[in-house]
């Protein structure tokens, strides 16, 4: 067992006079990154150093900026203190590795894209960052830095992909970001998809202009004014290139590259009905179509990246579903890197050594130092884009969730590996899907219900390693992407729910609610169509050039199904077309109870009934895909007859993604947004950020594990995060009102830890909870001397006395299940040989904690239990304790 004493201190909790709510007392309650890293996540931008072959940066779609100084073996997050985590572009100053530029907001605008707030710059290798402007651009595609003048930089901004915006185009600075000029502007609906600068003559710059706008049910990629633009004065002015071999008609996304060894050679990936890859050998004066091979660019709006070998103008790479290579100037291509995760978004080639490359893809990154013959990658980036999280009732409890691009994964909340929560404990219930929901059966956590995109539902039995396909309705119509003629429609994120009153009943959402009571063998609808069923919104997505029919834009479907714990038969439903529906009789009758003022095309991601109060439910709507980026959240206390908006105090442009009422404190509510978690102690009347030590990231789901009282978050960019033992959070208002308080410790387990080494799995280890019993107390002001926390056994005898922290606010120490240590051997000079720091490990049973705070003594009882898998009896544990206690008495007598 680990013998440790770990302390952390929370800040002072103050009362908000208007609401009686605890406002800032939870600022130092810490979140714990739980992983996993085994699946990686989408990397949108990569950059390396020409001078230092071990230095790399990468930007994640929703997971911030990461830096490696050892050739990719270890990565550290360097952007976690900033206000956003979505990254579109990363660039290292060619003249100074310490200067790094970051453009925020991913520019691959699929349905789960996250926004940014402009351009950041670091001059100390990522230690600190300064936002240098362009805050309203939202999605940045590329940053170019002049190798001859580091004060000269050009930024390509795609701009708001959900609405027309004046902040689209190319922006130029000549003073290192102090001031900016918008120099390429073709209208509010078109931005810049890519930029390329001539290495030898940096005044020559090419830009791809792209019209793109997304709606919840479709998107438009391409417009009349799109096309290729060129500047010969460093981006001050631009000229559109037309004719001379370039495609006619509407064009869409464009990817660009200039051959460093022959700057007259320019490559352009152009979304067009007339081809895919064009090449110019004369500085863009004339062009030729060199490839119409879809291997080069299979989904233009999502990929469209091209790169050229610095030493060979005919050696070309393209990033698409596969990484492709040409050695004949783009005429023919072959797929490479077959052992690397697919869906490639970024390529960087060392300018002085074309054998060294790094690529970014949907599973993270991959590196080569031999021109792509072999690739290395480590499962050490916890940047998973989870949609939902499901929690088991086992011990340690199982955590499951579905990830964009990377299946569903399940793992332990608390690893029994002393090294931490490594990738070794995580497993994929079903492979080969974009994961969405994954929930352990409440009766047996070894049975996992999970689904992939478009309603592909599976049941996985971990013990026997069997899986069953259990989708209620399978139709070739939906498989052929013509959902308008299908009787049932399933969302990219089709919801799964268990009835709280009978976990044998499982619900699955299409456009109706399906139910099964026999483990998914048979299903029946328990509702009519609960959506708007707007046929105009059920047509194939994409266009006008390329259709994109993956199912990500399927609409008029159900997003959430939740049953009320306090009322049998009460089921709440949220849809992706702006409805909240309710039944109070198990589905026999339904009522539309949508909050007034809801966006008719918004997504009700969560409708969460209170686990404590009848008739109370919270709803959150995300309407960003309609161009409405404001927060939307409501509460009802009368079954939806009346709703109250609860967005007071939230930033006006903060997308709302999830909501969850607390399971102990009826006034406490948690709100997940695009940039972190918020909490309210007055049912949503006022909000305070609960981000604390967590990076800015999209919070897609919020759950509470009731046995351990842990708050668990599904983030869309940084995997799973946990706040352990949230009773101090739940009872913060009472503590502040009392002036001092000892919170009741939770039941804790003497887990038997092991040291596990599993090859690549040791590349990543998330922190386990501190080993032992967390003991938390609140004091309004510090005392003259630090409080002593005394651990008592069931008879009232002292087991151990611990010196606590002495700060105003919440303080926490962890008792590690051990009795007082023996007296140190002071006759030995070397402290390592003076005796152990801990006494014998105690026997599971009843204990209490006692502490005096500002003249008052508090006692709270708690239980210590054995490892659930332990075979040793309590009598055997007692004998072991007696032996070690006797040895400690002998140790204590050595100096006497």
Model-derived features with residue positions:
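Extracytoplasmic/secretory ectodomains and luminal regions
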Residues: 733-896
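Positively charged n-region of N-terminal signal peptides that target proteins for export
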Residues: 1-4
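Beta-propeller blade termini and top-face loops
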Residues: 21-763, 770-772, 782
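Bacterial N-terminal signal peptides
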Residues: 6-17
């Amino acid at each position: 067992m680990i013998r440790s004493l770990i302390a952390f201190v929370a800040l002072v909790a103050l009362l908000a006079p208007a609401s009686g709510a605890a406002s800032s007392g939870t600022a130092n309650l810490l979140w714990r990154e739980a992983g996993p890293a085994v699946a990686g996540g989408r990397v949108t931008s990569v950059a390396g150093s020409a001078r230092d072959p071990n230095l790399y940066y990468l930007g994640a779609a929703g997971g911030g900026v990461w830096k490696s100084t050892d050739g990719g073996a270890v990565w550290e997050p360097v952007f976690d203190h900033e206000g956003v985590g979505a990254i579109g572009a990363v660039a290292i100053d060619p003249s100074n590795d310490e200067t790094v530029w970051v453009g925020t907001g991913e520019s691959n605008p699929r349905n789960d894209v996250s926004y940014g707030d402009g351009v950041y710059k670091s001059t100390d290798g990522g230690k600190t960052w300064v936002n240098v402007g362009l805050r309203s651009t939202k999605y940045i595609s590329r940053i170019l830095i002049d190798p001859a003048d580091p004060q000269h930089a050009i930024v390509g901004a795609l701009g708001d992909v959900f609405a027309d915006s004046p902040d689209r185009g190319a922006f130029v600075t000549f003073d290192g970001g102090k001031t900016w000029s918008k120099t390429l502007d073709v209208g509010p609906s078109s931005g810049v998809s890519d930029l390329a600068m001539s290495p030898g003559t940096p005044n020559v710059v090419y830009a791809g202009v792209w019209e793109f706008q997304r709606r919840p049910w479709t998107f438009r990629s391409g417009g009349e004014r799109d096309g290729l633009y060129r500047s010969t004065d460093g981006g001050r002015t631009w000229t559109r290139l037309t004719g001379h071999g370039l495609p006619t008609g509407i064009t869409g996304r464009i990817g660009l590259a200039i051959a460093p060894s022959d700057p007259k050679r320019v490559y352009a990936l152009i979304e067009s009905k007339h081809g895919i890859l064009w090449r110019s050998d004369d500085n863009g004066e004339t062009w030729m179509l060199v490839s119409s091979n879809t291997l080069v660019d299979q989904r233009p709006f999502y990929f469209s990246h091209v790169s050229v070998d610095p030493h060979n103008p005919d050696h070309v790479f393209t990033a698409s579903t596969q990484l492709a290579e040409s050695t004949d100037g783009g005429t023919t291509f072959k797929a490479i890197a077959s052992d690397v995760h697919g869906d490639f978004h970024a390529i960087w080639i060392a300018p002085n050594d074309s054998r060294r490359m790094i690529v970014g893809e949907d599973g993270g990154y991959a590196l080569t130092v031999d021109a792509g013959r072999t690739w290395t990658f480590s499962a050490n980036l916890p940047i998973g884009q989870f949609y939902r999280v499901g929690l088991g009732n086992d011990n340690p409890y199982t955590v499951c969730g579905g990830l964009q691009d990377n299946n569903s994964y399940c793992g332990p909340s608390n690893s029994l590996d002393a090294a931490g929560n490594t990738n070794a404990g995580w497993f994929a219930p079903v492979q080969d899907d974009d994961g969405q929901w994954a929930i352990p059966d409440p009766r047996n956590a070894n049975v996992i219900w999970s689904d992939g995109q478009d309603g592909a539902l599976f049941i996985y039995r971990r013990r026997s390693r069997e899986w069953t396909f259990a989708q209620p309705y399978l139709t070739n119509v939906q498989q052929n992407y013509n959902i308008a003629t299908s009787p049932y429609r399933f969302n990219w994120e089709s919801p799964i729910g268990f009835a709280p009153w009978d976990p044998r009943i499982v619900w699955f959402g299409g456009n109706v609610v399906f139910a099964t009571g026999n483990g998914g063998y048979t299903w029946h609808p328990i509702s009519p169509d609960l959506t708007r069923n707007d046929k105009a919104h059920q047509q194939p997505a994409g266009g006008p050039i390329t259709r994109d029919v993956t199912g990500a834009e399927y609409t008029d479907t159900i997003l959430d199904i939740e049953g009320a714990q306090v009322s049998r038969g009460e089921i709440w439903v949220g849809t992706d077309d702006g409805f909240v529906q309710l039944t109070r009789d198990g589905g026999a009758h339904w009522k539309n109870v949508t909050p007034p003022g809801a966006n008719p095309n918004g997504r009700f991601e969560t409708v969460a009934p209170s686990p404590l109060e009848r008739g109370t439910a919270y709803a959150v709507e995300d309407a960003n895909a309609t161009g409405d980026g404001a927060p939307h959240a409501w509460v009802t206390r009368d079954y939806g007859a009346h709703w109250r908006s609860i967005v007071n105090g939230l930033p006006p442009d903060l997308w709302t993604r999830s909501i969850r009422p607390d399971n102990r404190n009826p006034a406490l509510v948690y709100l997940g947004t695009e940039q972190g978690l918020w909490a309210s102690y007055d049912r949503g009347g006022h909000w305070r950020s609960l981000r604390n030590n967590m990076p800015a990231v999209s919070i897609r789901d919020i759950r509470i594990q009731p046995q351990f009282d842990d708050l668990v978050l599904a983030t869309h960019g940084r995997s799973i995060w946990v706040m352990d033992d949230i009773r101090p959070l739940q009872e913060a208002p009472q503590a502040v009102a009392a002036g001092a308080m000892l919170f009741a410790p939770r039941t804790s387990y003497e887990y038997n830890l092991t040291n596990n080494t599993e090859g690549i799995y040791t590349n990543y280890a998330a922190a386990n909870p501190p080993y032992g019993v967390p003991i938390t107390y609140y004091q309004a002001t510090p005392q003259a001397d630090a409080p002593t926390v005394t651990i008592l056994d069931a008879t009232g005898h002292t087991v151990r006395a611990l010196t606590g922290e002495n700060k105003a606010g919440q303080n926490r120490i962890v008792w590690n299940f051990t009795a007082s240590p023996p007296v140190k051997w002071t006759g030995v000079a070397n402290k390592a040989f003076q005796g152990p720091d801990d006494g014998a490990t105690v026997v599971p049973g009843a204990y209490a904690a006692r502490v005096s705070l500002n003249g008052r003594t508090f006692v709270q009882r708690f239980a210590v239990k054995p490892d659930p898998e332990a075979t040793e009896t309590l009598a055997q544990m007692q004998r072991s304790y007696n032996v070690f206690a006797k040895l400690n008495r002998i140790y204590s007598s050595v100096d006497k």
